[in-house]
């Protein structure tokens, strides 16, 4: 008679299902077999990626679009080091990511036995880029560690968590059935009443109030729109906050704090309210914003209140709950927004007039994309010049619709993140914006996309046959360009080999037609746009 007692690996999978996990990304290996024993019948879909970096980026894209934690399974040693870059990206951008990995037998840890996939201290590898990295020393440690992980995702600044499980713990029989011990205790509430009142008093007296909102405010779009209207306040977003206000809203200055007109406008504010943003230089393309007024900060992470820009009022709490309370504390009559609306109109015109030749090409491409991307569509972008322009030029229609690796800035993000986003929201048409350099980092994940996706995903490959940004930076610094003009493969042939539909438009009109057809076609379409064809 077979023993029906669950192994640690089986029980862990069932526990994750209880937490609402529906999809995991990964590659099975000899050290994770017990995890895979638990998948059949669990209700969890496994997505086979072609590299652990792809697994991590897919989990990131899944989380950004769905708002739920992305989960991946990786093997000990090389699996962990391969997924470290996506973990770092998720850490920088505050994305909820749960990485479950194996690790060598408990008795061998730290002894340098030369075991397969051995590292000196696997937990320490990811500790600096996670909310916490933990080692499960028994199956009974696992429910506590998973509960801690979801406490981070639900109640704190959502950052990655890594749990290493030794081989013997994965294979061990559980002493009791803890698979139903799901503990989710969201504890986010409003800031202290006295702080909210102080902020309301400051904002009520402001002559030129402005708002900056980021990824920590994605669930508070309605409140931010109401607050901007109530105060007559110019509204800026970070790249992660794109879509919080409708692009056409007259007070919406968008993600323009990375260009001169945005810097000039924010410098005129006498009070700035920053909501759910760390106000980092990766959003602003300069070390510091020219803030001349009083700064109020609302954040779930109290460590942000004195980072870079110390604030006069610190609102420690959930963005939505705190903004609801702040709106209650403010006068109900909207302030006169005429001057602010005029200032935003001037900013928009200045941004359009201030584009250099390359940015004008980018703008033309982005306009064609905006004309064809369905209203509910999303864009996952890589670190490429076209996306840098799109960060502030592209008219994002809703939150969770522009996915960009802002903080860590890694190449190779766009394609796997777009695949993960499609799996997190299969009903939404998706577009990947990627340059030829970044595409080569993770193009093998086209195999995953073709295998898994049944609805439209368009990959727009911006091919200038160069590491364009680095080449331009070298030239700006009077450095002779070296290592920036690679010999690229035949991308169209590669994509066809993976099973993609492929087109190579020769003009922007053809690009728009190919985009239209791609969004109407189920599966993966690669559109390779050469720089010369976009002029």
What is the meaning of each model-derived region?
Residues 12, 17, 27-40, 344-427:
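Active-site diphosphate/adenylate-binding microenvironment
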Residues 2-333, 368, 372-375, 454-459:
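N-terminal alpha/beta PP-like core and its mobile active-site loop of ThDP/TPP-dependent enzymes
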Residues 29, 221, 263, 317-320, ...:
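Conserved structured core elements
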Residues 213-216, 276, 382-384, 529-531:
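Structural motif
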């Amino acid at each position: 008679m077979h023993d029906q007692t669950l192994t640690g690996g089986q029980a862990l999978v069932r526990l994750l299902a209880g937490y609402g996990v529906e999809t995991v990304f990964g590659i099975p290996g000899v050290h994770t077999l017990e995890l895979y024993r638990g998948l059949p019948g669990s209700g969890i879909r496994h997505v086979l990626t072609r590299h652990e970096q792809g697994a991590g980026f897919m989990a990131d894209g899944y989380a950004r679009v769905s708002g739920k934690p992305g989960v991946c399974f990786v093997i000990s040693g090389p699996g962990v080091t391969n997924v470290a870059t996506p973990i770092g990206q998720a850490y920088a951008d505050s994305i909820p990511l749960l990485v479950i990995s194996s690790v060598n037998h408990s008795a061998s840890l730290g002894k340098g036995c030369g075991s397969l996939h051995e590292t000196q201290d696997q937990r320490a590898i990811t500790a600096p880029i996670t909310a916490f990295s933990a080692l499960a020393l028994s199956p009974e440690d696992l429910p506590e560690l998973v509960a801690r992980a979801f406490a981070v995702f639900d109640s704190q600044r959502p950052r990655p968590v890594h749990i290493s499980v030794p081989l013997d713990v994965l294979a061990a029989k559980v002493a009791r059935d803890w698979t139903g011990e799901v503990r989710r205790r969201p504890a986010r509430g409003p800031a202290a009443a006295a702080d909210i009142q102080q902020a309301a008093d400051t904002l009520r007296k402001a002559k030129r109030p402005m708002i900056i909102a980021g990824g920590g405010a994605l669930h508070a779009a309605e409140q931010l729109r109401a607050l901007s209207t109530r105060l007559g306040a110019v509204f800026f977003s970070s790249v992660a906050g794109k879509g919080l206000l409708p692009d056409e809203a007259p007070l919406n200055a968008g993600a323009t704090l990375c260009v001169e007109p945005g810097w000039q406008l924010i410098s005129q504010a006498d009070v700035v309210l920053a909501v759910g943003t760390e106000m980092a230089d990766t959003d602003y393309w300069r070390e510091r914003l020219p803030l001349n007024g009083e700064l109020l900060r609302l954040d779930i992470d109290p460590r942000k209140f004195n980072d870079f820009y110390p604030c006069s009022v610190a609102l420690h709490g959930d963005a939505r709950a705190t903004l609801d309370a702040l709106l209650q504390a403010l006068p109900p009559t909207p302030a006169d927004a005429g001057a602010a609306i005029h200032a935003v109109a001037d900013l928009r015109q200045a941004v359009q007039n201030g584009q250099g030749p390359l940015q004008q090409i980018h703008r033309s491409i982005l306009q064609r994309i905006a004309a064809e991307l369905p209203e509910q569509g999303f864009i996952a972008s890589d670190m490429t010049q076209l996306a840098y322009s799109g960060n502030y030029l592209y008219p994002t229609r809703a939150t969770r619709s522009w996915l960009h690796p802002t903080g860590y800035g890694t190449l190779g993000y766009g394609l796997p993140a777009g695949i993960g986003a499609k799996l997190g929201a299969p009903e939404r048409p998706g577009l990947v914006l990627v340059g030829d350099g970044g595409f080569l980092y993770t193009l093998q994940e086209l195999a995953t996309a073709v295998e898994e996706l049944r609805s439209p995903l368009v990959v727009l490959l911006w091919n200038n046959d160069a590491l364009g940004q680095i080449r331009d930076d070298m030239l700006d610094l009077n450095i002779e360009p070296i290592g920036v003009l690679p010999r690229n493969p035949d991308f169209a042939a590669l994509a066809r080999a993976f099973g993609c539909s492929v087109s190579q438009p020769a003009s922007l009109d053809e690009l728009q037609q190919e985009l239209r057809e791609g969004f109407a076609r189920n599966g993966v379409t690669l559109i390779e746009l050469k720089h010369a064809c976009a002029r």
